[in-house]
Amino acid sequence: MTLEEYIAHLNGLAFWKEFTFAQNKFMPRPGAEFELADNLVWFGTYAIAMQLKQRNEETQDSETERSWFQNKVLGQATSEIRDTLRFLQEHEQIHITNERGHSFDIGSAELTDITKIVVFLGGRALPEDCWQTRYHISRTQGSFILLPRTII
């Protein structure tokens, strides 16, 4: 089971499949496909936007693993969540389908609060301080919660 499948399953159990959205590709115009988020949990005016990063080609070198963490978790994943927030602002409605197969249109007009979470599964040689990192502060989007797969 991939990290994305695991989180979709876990969120489906915790938040019910009606509120969990794991298939979030949308096309704002022909030929342009984007992903809103790896996983989205949506309750009316509140949403949790999640990006998931899994280390597939781990090494035994802790500095290589630290570099992966900095580039993929702190860099790419937080950038992708910033894209999620931008997509919601730029598009009046984005059509998404929940884990029950029901489709909805979501837009920033109805969202008053969005929690930003990055879930990561690093390699065995990932340094302990990376595993213990629980937040990231963005200059433009505030704080992001970081959760290692080991605690969920």
What name fits each language-model region?
Residues M1-I152:
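Intrinsically disordered, low-complexity Ser/Thr/Pro/Gly-rich regulatory segments
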